[in-house]
């Protein structure tokens, strides 16, 4: 029987671009685990995406996942836009390279391992887990330890 895991994610950036971080809450039955990491130079969207990628990578086996994010960019990108990007060889409708293609490809790979149901919540609206993720992401952004090697300043 496939395990059902709840995942909550958030990304933060102090300046955009600037130092950033992600926060994750993973819940399986009654057990919760939190993850966070800060990066010296990145963007808000990259941190939102990286949170989802890392959370899904953390799962050791294929799972039924309910993933809740406050990022429409992530939710719409992975459920709607990605299909045409892949058909066009990771180009947008106007033939430009898709931004953050490295993370979209990683997210695509991870979602293929799991059955993911994507949910959106309004940020800063009192959702307990989203508020926890927001705090984790902000704290991580204030104390960055990693380099976002995929980030390219444009």
Curated annotation (Swiss-Prot):
What InterPro entries does the entry give? RNase_H (IPR050092), RNaseH-like_sf (IPR012337), RNaseH_domain (IPR002156), RNaseH_sf (IPR036397), RNaseHI (IPR022892)
As its record notes, the protein acts as a catalyst of: Endonucleolytic cleavage to 5'-phosphomonoester
Q: Name one GO molecular function term.
A: RNA-DNA hybrid ribonuclease activity
- Names of required cofactors: Mg(2+)
- Residues binding Mg(2+) 1: 10, 48, 70
Q: Where are the transmembrane segments?
A: none
Q: Which domain of life is it from?
A: Bacteria
Keyword set, alphabetical order: Cytoplasm, Endonuclease, Hydrolase, Magnesium, Metal-binding, Nuclease
Report if keyword Isomerase is assigned.
Answer: no
Asked if the record carries the keyword Metal-binding, the reply is yes
Documented EC number(s): 3.1.26.4
The record's function comment reads: Endonuclease that specifically degrades the RNA of RNA-DNA hybrids.
PANTHER family in the record: RIBONUCLEASE H1
Protein name per its UniProtKB record: Ribonuclease H
Q: What is the lineage of its organism?
A: Bacteria, Pseudomonadati, Pseudomonadota, Gammaproteobacteria, Vibrionales
**This protein's encoding gene:** rnhA
């Amino acid at each position: 029987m496939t395990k059902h895991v709840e995942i909550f994610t958030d990304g933060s950036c102090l300046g955009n671009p600037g130092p950033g971080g992600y926060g994750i809450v993973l819940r399986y039955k009654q057990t919760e685990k939190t993850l966070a990491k800060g990066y010296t130079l990145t963007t808000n969207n990259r941190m939102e995406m990286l949170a989802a990628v890392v959370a899904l990578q953390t799962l050791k086996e294929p799972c039924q996942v309910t993933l809740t994010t406050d990022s429409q960019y992530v939710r719409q990108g992975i459920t709607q836009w990605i299909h045409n990007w892949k058909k066009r060889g990771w180009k947008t409708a106007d033939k430009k390279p898709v931004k953050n293609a490295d993370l979209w490809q990683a997210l695509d790979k991870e979602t293929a391992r799991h059955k993911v149901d994507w949910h959106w919540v309004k940020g800063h609206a009192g959702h307990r887990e989203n508020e926890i993720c927001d705090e984790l992401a902000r704290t991580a952004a204030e104390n960055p330890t990693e380099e976002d090697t995929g980030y390219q300043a444009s």
